[in-house]
């Protein structure tokens, strides 16, 4: 859980930094990819173990595509109950559904449920953090078969930016011993999201 929190903190800090600097979109994503590789290269934060860590050079990514950065309509769902998020292990973290994002991508009308971790929201560093676990038609082919994750910030208005170029694999893709959230059926996207982190030969 500690390493996962560090990864989330990196992603939040990264988003804040890029908002302060005038980077091109491609530079923004390249910096995100670089920092994610740094995270995986650091023995203190990497989910990789043993030989996998020693052999690690960099994560593979889809080509950067602005098409996969979408501005979605955002509906808050304030009356949703707290629930135990199913995971791949014994851990059952508490979440609420914070809202629903609706958008068009690859000529399809799609939607994603967005969640808030009840423990993290009590920490000032993560108070505005939102989480999307999702599946798409690349699972088991070019991406991890158990889905990918996105981290976002609570928006101020009724839209939210979802950038699939920042989609990443759960730690379970790289090592045993983690309890990773399982994307709900509602977040199965009926399209191929050819963006974000690839999954080949464990890296």
Identify the function of each model-found stretch.
Residues 168-203:
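Extended, aromatic/histidine-rich regions of cofactor-dependent oxidoreductases associated
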Residues 66, 106-110, 158:
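Short acidic/polar mixed-charge low-complexity motifs
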Residues 131-168:
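Acidic, glycine-rich flexible loop segments
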Residues 78-145:
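Mid-length scaffold segments of soluble, non-membrane domains
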Residues 20-79:
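Start-of-domain marker
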Residues 1-24:
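Bacterial Sec-dependent N-terminal signal peptides
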Residues 74, 114-118, 136-138, 164-168, ...:
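A mature extracytoplasmic/lumenal domain signature
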């Amino acid at each position: 859980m500690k390493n996962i929190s560090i990864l989330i903190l990196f992603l939040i800090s990264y988003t804040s930094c890029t908002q302060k600097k005038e980077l091109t979109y491609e530079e923004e994503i390249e910096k995100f990819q670089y920092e994610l590789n740094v995270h995986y290269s650091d023995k203190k934060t990497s989910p990789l173990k043993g030989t996998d860590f020693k052999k690690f050079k960099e994560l593979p990514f889809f080509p950067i595509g602005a098409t996969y950065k979408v501005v979605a309509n955002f509906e808050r769902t304030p009356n949703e109950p707290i629930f135990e998020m199913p995971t791949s292990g014994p851990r059952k973290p508490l979440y609420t559904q914070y809202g629903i994002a609706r958008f068009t991508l690859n000529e399809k009308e799609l939607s994603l449920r967005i969640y808030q971790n009840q423990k993290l929201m009590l920490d000032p560093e993560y108070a505005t953090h939102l989480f999307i676990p999702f599946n798409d038609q690349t699972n088991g082919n070019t991406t991890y078969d158990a889905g990918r994750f996105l981290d976002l910030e609570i928006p101020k208005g009724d839209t939210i930016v979802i950038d699939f170029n920042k989609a990443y694999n759960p730690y379970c893709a790289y090592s045993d011993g983690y309890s990773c959230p399982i994307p709900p059926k509602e977040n199965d996207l009926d399209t191929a999201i050819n963006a974000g982190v690839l999954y080949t030969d464990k890296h």
